């Protein structure tokens, strides 16, 4: 049995299988998941687990070269945005797109991780980097 790292077997496998430029989405309660895209549903109840808790664990375990966020988070959820940006390494590039475009982009992710987050625009697409 694992003692450290990601203990959820679905999340661990997802992280282990990521290659350079592969993408994963961490989403709030309301983010729709396209047909055919795996959904790893971690939500227990409204707010649990939080977007930030899930993001923290994933950032500890995968190398991220780019993140994609909804432009709307800047005005609708600035506290979430500032906490999120504080966690990113300076080398991570940040792209803002419309929320509608971000939802379209989830059609090309390896999986959507659904959290219990209940604040607006708490969605992010993480693009995997490479360690060599």
Swiss-Prot record:
Substrate binds at residues 28, 99, 121-123. NCBIfam families: PRK11797.1 (NF008761). Pathway: Carbohydrate metabolism; D-ribose degradation; D-ribose 5-phosphate from beta-D-ribopyranose: step 1/2. Belongs to the RbsD / FucU family. RbsD subfamily. GO terms for molecular function: D-ribose pyranase activity; intramolecular lyase activity; monosaccharide binding. Transmembrane segments: none annotated. It is an enzyme of class 5 (isomerase). The active site is at residue 20. It comes from the Bacteria. Its main location: cytoplasm. Homodecamer. It catalyses: beta-D-ribopyranose = beta-D-ribofuranose. GO terms for biological process: D-ribose catabolic process. GO terms for cellular component: cytosol. Its EC number is 5.4.99.62. It is found in: Cytoplasm. Signal peptide: none annotated. The keyword Cytoplasm applies. Catalyzes the interconversion of beta-pyran and beta-furan forms of D-ribose. This is D-ribose pyranase.
